[in-house]
Amino acid sequence: MTIGTLLHSTATANPNHPALCAGPDTITYGELDDSATRLARWLLDQGLRPGDRLALHWHNSIEAALLYFAAFRAGLIAVPINLRLKPAEVAFIFENSGAAMCFSAPALAPCAEHAAAACPAMRRILSAIPTAASSAAIPDVDPDRPAVILYTSGTTARPKGVVHTHRSFLEITRAGIDSHLICGGGVSLAMTPMMHAAGLAVTISAVHTGATAVLVPFDAGAVLDAIERHRCTFFFVLPALGQFLVEEQIRRPRDVSSLQIVVAGGDTVPAALQQRFHQHFGFQLQEGYGLTEGGFLAFNPSHAIRIGSIGLPLANVELRLVDPTGRDVPEGEPGEIVVRTPCMTNGYWNDPAATADLMRDGWLHTGDLAHRDPDGYLWFRGRSKQIIIRAGSNISPQEVEEALYRHPAVLEAGVVGQPDPVYGELVVAFVALRPGADVTASGLQNFAREHLADYKTPERILFLPQLPKGPTGKVDRRTLKESLRTDSAATAGA
């Protein structure tokens, strides 16, 4: 089965069931399948062929979903473009992917057009979806052919294109549904952009089960309004955005009693956020772990949540924790997470060296560190490339951030290492405070010392109105680290 035939199958069984809602607009499965088929034929009429890359530069909407499903139906490879990227960054993705055509929403089209000027292979930028009829034949698509290239910033200077086939991406959605990580029915709220693996998975999972997906750009008030209006049963949230949902629910409570599952992932979930979410939403966030290259890998089951843990490996995931030599580490000791699963990528587009580093002896090497407790639960210990080494001691940025989040004045925290000639690296924390909160850098340092060893306590705390975010909404530690070179982006607290 391919993603396109999945939609057709669901539409045949439930043609009149709402597939997607966005604002006041709704489209049924029958309408979505018919529109996607007609658009797929039009794309093929333009000279595109199966395997060609189609760039998609569009916000979460019915139009965006239609473009994705049309690309999948035509056998094209969808190349989502992050809406926050600048023209030079978009140009790199155009060039690296070899995309021949791009659909860019009207407000975003100037950026795409500027980027395309430097890319001879990019033939057309379109900011409207055509409605012309076409009789082009829809090809049979091999499930093992690429369906999407998801560009991930990771920890390198240039983004890498993660390739997923129709089969591997449908395995991701199936694994999420089978493990109850994704709600298998009801109404799913899709606020994570579809250029993010989790955002696309939520939308396709709804098609997998014949559910309805409500598409909402992230705005805390709009998200909560949509939950109340559509009686949503599920959503996925990045921890950094979860903080803002709690603040908005405190400011103006909505009826969120319809919710059954809320999954947090993409970064560690502070215990303070868990506590506040439970207080104001009435149940616990279910923390999980995954990555663009491997799909959903671990999850806290609803009947046995361990706060602070990333959960248990999913049933279809072989997961090991290994030392730098590739040997399994003892229980309780940190090791790199390596996995083998039908959900994992074929590799990075046009980057054999990075692919060889990622995939070794059939195992996907995540670069993430964790330890396993006696009951098999996994506890995230940070990324190997983000570990701060101070005087020979390893310090996890996430552990320091967790301590800072316990302070009631802290809304956001990001911790990085600053090079130092004596200690190797110093611990530096960037903090954004809650509206109306007041605390000094020394006050936060004293608070942190109550929860951390002396060598883990930040030597410096710098305040920002808000922390910079990466393309997926996570705190951008790389930008924070670069700002330390001049200190131009922050002012030290008194």
Where are these regions (language model features)?
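Conserved ATP/PPi-binding loop(s) of AMP-dependent carboxylate-activating enzymes
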Residues: 312-316, 327-358, 395
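Conserved beta-loop-beta connector loops within the AMP-binding
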Residues: 320-338, 374-375, 437-441, 476
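Conserved pre-ATP/AMP-binding loop-to-beta segment of ANL
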Residues: 16, 134-151, 158, 181-187
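Conserved AMP-binding A3 loop
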Residues: 28-30, 147-174
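Conserved AMP-binding/adenylate-forming
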Residues: 25, 40-85, 394
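AMP-binding/adenylate-forming catalytic core of the ANL superfamily
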Residues: 85, 102-104, 235, 341, ...
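Gly/Ser/Thr-rich phosphate-binding loop
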Residues: 208, 232-236, 246-307, 318
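Conserved AMP-binding/adenylation subdomain of ANL enzymes
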Residues: 170-187, 195-233, 248-249
